[in-house]
């Protein structure tokens, strides 16, 4: 069995391998899309199909807790939105600490791509601020597509 501390650099190295040997960044994105469809059909997809944005909230509160993330999350069920500020992503944090490898340059890109189709197919849009990924930080909002834009200040939590 591979531990999570071993999986993280292996995942990053796989992205680099696909990028180098399999057709560049577009091939990596196709891989992320495939993983998203295959993996999320068993956990996120049933939750958002049945519960909408509340199912997304349930999924992320559980998964981010399991990952022991330093994250602040806000749920606004009245406006159909959930916001998160990942103050320190443990996965990217580990990669930044390693001196023996260089992380895949778009490692954090997998988060936006993995979930996009499942969310969109169930009426949920997402936006993200990935300007802080070089120090393991990002912000994201997920919102009901029919509600237009994410609420003001989502990128400031």
Where are these regions (language model features)?
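N-terminal accessory segment detector
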Residues: 1-109, 117-139, 143-157
């Amino acid at each position: 069995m591979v531990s999570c501390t071993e999986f993280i650099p292996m995942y990053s190295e796989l992205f680099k391998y696909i990028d180098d040997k399999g057709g560049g960044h577009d091939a990596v994105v196709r891989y992320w899309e495939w993983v998203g469809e295959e993996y999320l059909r068993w956990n996120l997809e049933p939750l958002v199909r049945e519960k909408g944005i509340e199912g997304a909230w349930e999924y992320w509160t559980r998964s981010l807790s399991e990952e022991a993330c330093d994250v602040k999350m806000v749920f606004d069920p009245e406006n159909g939105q959930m916001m998160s500020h990942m103050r320190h992503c443990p996965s990217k944090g580990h990669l930044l600490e390693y001196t023996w490898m260089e992380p895949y340059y778009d490692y954090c890109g997998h988060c936006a791509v993995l979930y996009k189709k499942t969310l969109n197919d169930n009426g949920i849009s997402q936006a993200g601020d990935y300007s802080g990924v070089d120090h393991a930080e990002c912000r994201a909002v997920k919102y009901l597509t029919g509600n237009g834009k994410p609420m003001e200040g989502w990128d400031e939590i």
